[in-house]
UniProtKB/Swiss-Prot annotation:
Binding site for FAD: E36, R37, Y38, H39, N40, V41, G42, G43, G44, C45
Record-linked HAMAP family: SthA (MF_00247)
NCBIfam families assigned: PRK05249.1
Role this protein plays: Conversion of NADPH, generated by peripheral catabolic pathways, to NADH, which can enter the respiratory chain for energy generation.
PANTHER family named in the record: DISULFIDE OXIDOREDUCTASE, SOLUBLE PYRIDINE NUCLEOTIDE TRANSHYDROGENASE
EC number(s) per entry: 1.6.1.1
One Gene Ontology term, aspect cellular component: cytosol
Biological classification of the source: Bacteria, Pseudomonadati, Pseudomonadota, Gammaproteobacteria, Enterobacterales
UniProt keyword list: Cytoplasm, FAD, Flavoprotein, NAD, NADP, Oxidoreductase
Source superkingdom: Bacteria
Organism: Enterobacter sp. (strain 638)
Predominant location: cytoplasm
SUPFAM superfamilies for this protein: FAD/NAD(P)-binding domain, FAD/NAD-linked reductases, dimerisation (C-terminal) domain
Top class in the EC scheme: oxidoreductase
Name of the protein this chain belongs to: Soluble pyridine nucleotide transhydrogenase
Length: 466
């Protein structure tokens, strides 16, 4: 690469996508700087998104597990924790993650520049530092990995102390008894689980006709039933007319004529790419209405020397995929092409209580494609390990081709679903006939384990063939 620039490459953002790109670049010998606008590395994933919300979920799920365990049923009072106490656990995890990720950059001699950056021209950035000074830095190539933030419609007053988004909810300073959650996507459903697990009343407003429509319908229905059974009130096909924030709560007026009141509102309906501060107009790049950039298969934007990865390019908007996108972009940036690519079937993990995870095709997709598939199921309540740990709610479903026995999709609802799914994913990725449901019948599993669900489901499915 040319040495007429300050750096071979500058990465804007230190979340999963930026980290993946930066590590991939320095490992190939590039001179790299990473720009981070906040005081600590890690991006939204570490500080406001994946890590804190999953730490919250874990703490709440352990409280639920204790309170429902028959071993402790003789205790006269239930175990409870305040939201502030649980947030302390999340803060501990965030600090550990931040220190670890800071170490990655230090060990690999990757320079971190703190401040807000915007493009001056196609090879120059202006960096406004925290002390107010402005520096000009240049690079031959760039990776935009600045992530996303919660979408804020203009008619919702997010400055009001009773109105939160998925970032600011982590600064909740009071103990709500009733929460309105607008938006029943992944974030909305995860926080509905968290609040309901803390015995908070939850109204979940869904703008669509069912929860998480991208899931296999049985998984979506299982979540809906579990929410209903735990007391979450779900209102489908609703949109707000206006939101009225008061001193003691929030009133939501729906277009259907309904009115809802709660102690606070969590608005969780969509996200926006953090591109508005980059002055992309100075280099001729444009974004869509949600601030997202279009890229090709090597993550190049319309300007070939500028790449973009992670939430800022939209789907799949997963931390796991963003890291891989960063590594692929780094390879393309240095070598001019990328031999690596994202796998076709990216697993999804939804950290509700219980978890949901899936990989591959759904029943609805296979039916519309007219694929002759069969279904194998295992109920967690029949597994010795689930009975031992008292987590009998859940199911594993394997979809496979009736004729070739090839696994086409795996769907799991229950505790540890996001871990369990990877066993099946590993077999699905096998080539040369290695992807077969018969693997689970012919292998030996540790006993007792949750992994045994694969053998149970495989036998159940194969027994349906004739």
């Amino acid at each position: 690469m040319s040495h007429s620039y300050d750096y071979d490459a500058i990465v804007i953002g230190s979340g999963p996508g930026g980290e993946g790109a930066a590590m991939g670049l320095v490992k190939q010998g590039a001179r790299v700087a990473v720009i981070e606008r906040y005081h600590n590395v890690g991006g939204g994933c570490t500080h406001w998104g994946t890590i804190p919300s999953k730490a919250l979920r874990h703490a709440v799920s352990r409280i639920i597990e204790f309170n429902q365990n028959p071993l402790y049923s003789d205790h006269s009072r239930l175990l409870r924790s305040s939201f502030a106490d649980i947030l302390n656990h999340a803060d501990t995890v965030i600090n550990q993650q931040t220190r670890m990720r800071q170490g990655f950059y230090e060990r690999n001699h990757c320079e971190i520049l703190q401040g807000d950056a915007h493009f001056v021209d196609e090879h120059t950035l202006a960096l406004k530092c925290h002390d107010g000074s402005v520096e000009t830095i240049t690079a031959e190539k760039f990776v935009i990995a600045c992530g996303s933030r919660p979408y804020h419609p203009d008619d919702v007053d997010f400055s009001h102390p009773r109105v939160y988004d998925s970032d600011s909810i982590l600064s909740l300073h009071h103990e709500p008894r009733h929460v309105l959650i607008y938006g029943a996507g992944v974030i909305g459903c995860e926080y509905a689980s968290i609040f309901r697990g803390m015995e908070v009343k939850v109204d979940l407003i869904n703008t669509r006709d069912r929860l998480l429509a991208f899931l296999d319908q049985e998984m979506s229905d299982s979540l809906s039933y579990h929410f209903w059974n735990s007391g979450v009130v779900i209102r489908h096909n609703e949109e707000y007319e206006r939101i009225e924030a008061c001193d003691d709560g929030v009133i939501m007026h729906l277009k259907s004529g309904k009115k809802l009141k709660a102690d606070c509102l969590l608005y969780a309906n969509g996200r926006t790419g953090n591109t508005d501060s980059l002055a992309l107009e100075n280099i001729g790049l444009t974004t869509d209405s949600r601030g997202q950039l279009k890229v090709n298969s090597m993550y190049q934007t319309a300007l070939p020397h500028i790449y973009a990865v992670g939430d800022v390019i939209g789907y799949p908007s997963l931390a796991s995929a963003a890291y891989d996108q960063g590594r692929i972009a780094a390879q393309a940036l240095v070598k001019g092409e990328a031999t690596a690519h994202l796998i076709e079937d990216i697993p999804t993990g939804i950290y509700t209580i219980p978890e949901i995870s899936s990989v591959g095709k759904t029943e609805q997709q296979l039916t519309s494609m007219k694929v002759p598939y069969e279904v194998g199921r295992a109920q967690f309540k029949h597994l010795a390990r689930a009975q031992i740990v008292g987590m009998s709610v859940g199911t594993l479903k394997i979809l496979f081709h009736r004729e070739t026995k090839e696994i086409l999709g795996i769907h799991c609802f229950g505790e540890r679903a996001a871990e369990i799914i990877h066993i099946g994913q590993a077999i699905m990725e096998q080539k040369g006939g290695g992807n077969t449901i018969e693997y689970f019948v012919n292998t030996t599993f540790n006993y007792p384990t949750m992994a045994e669900a694969y053998r149970v489901a495989a036998l159940n499915g194969l027994n349906r063939l004739f």
